[in-house]
Amino acid sequence: MRKLSIPFLVASAMLVLGIVGGLACDERPERPIVHRAGYRVLEGDFHAHTAWSDGSLSPLGIVRQAARRGLDVVSITEHNTVLPSRAARWYAELTGGPIVITGEEVTTARFHVIALGIEHTVSPDQPLEDVISKIHSQHGIAIAAHPVQHFWPSVLPHRSEFDAAEVMHPIAYSERSADWRWADMVRFYEESPTPLGAIGSSDYHWMSVLGLCRTLLFVREPVSEAAVLEALREKHTVTIDREGKAYGDKALVAALRDEPYVPRTSDYAYRGSSTADRILRTLGWLGLLGVLLLRARAKTPELTPESPEPDS
């Protein structure tokens, strides 16, 4: 067994100290307790991706980012797998983070469906009606993800089978093309023959803002994962668009009109700002650099001069 050098041990200790100290100093904005219409109001984001596929953060990183962004509830909805969200829920329960609702984005070329409150992955290799049925068989919530015209041929015939639809989404701020328009998402929701829950989601990947679009949940106390899922099933949700218009349960929208509520979407600090935090993070980065350099140096073979050949 190769003996570890003192410089390597020092660099490793700096790295560990930086990680532990950075976590200890992490900003967690206060999430005030708010009531409207006899319910506790929570802010949630139900559409986020991780480095497992095309995101930038780990499931644990999403939980920490949700805490920094003042979210009460978050759901990791990775493409065609529920496993990252289960890891995030474990971490949130361990650290006292936001409530994590397990989820998956069932993703195909024809439709995208957010499945919330499930424990087992729902396969995308089946018709949409079967996808929704499999979600419901797990007592989950089926949400039409960004239902723009691009997906209408598949999702419109089954609109009444969904529990909810995304109404607010980053598409509202940057539309791609004629069949990816935010106005059509609103039409999908408003023209539904049966009421749908109104959802606001950030569809978080990378170089974006978690919690940019939020869902206001009207939850019965005590607050819990089960209470959040109950609010979603009962369609006790509201989302507010970029102009301040509210979509959702009419009685709850009226309650917000009588007593306005402004979602906490302003930017919070993404890291601690104290002197101790800066020192610890600097030590962590220096430690990481030291570990990488020392490992690279250890792998480089040493060149030794060739021994002279003996005289014949």
Regions found by a protein language model. Give the residues of each.
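Charged catalytic cores and adjacent phosphate/nucleic-acid-binding surfaces used
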Residues: 2-44, 109-120, 150-312
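An N-terminally biased module of ancient metal coordination in phosphate/nucleic-acid-related enzymes
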Residues: 16-110, 306, 311
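Short, flexible loop segments at the rims of nucleotide/cofactor-binding pockets, characterized by
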Residues: 49-54, 118-122, 143-144, 173-177
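Non-catalytic positions within long, well-ordered alpha-helices that form the structural scaffold/packing
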Residues: 67-68, 136, 158
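Conserved beta-strand positions in the central sheet of alpha/beta enzyme cores
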Residues: 75-76, 143-144, 166
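Binuclear metal-dependent hydrolase catalytic cores centered on His/Asp/Glu-rich metal-binding motifs
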Residues: 112-141
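Aromatic-lined carbohydrate-recognition surfaces of secreted/lumenal glycan-active proteins
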Residues: 136-151, 245
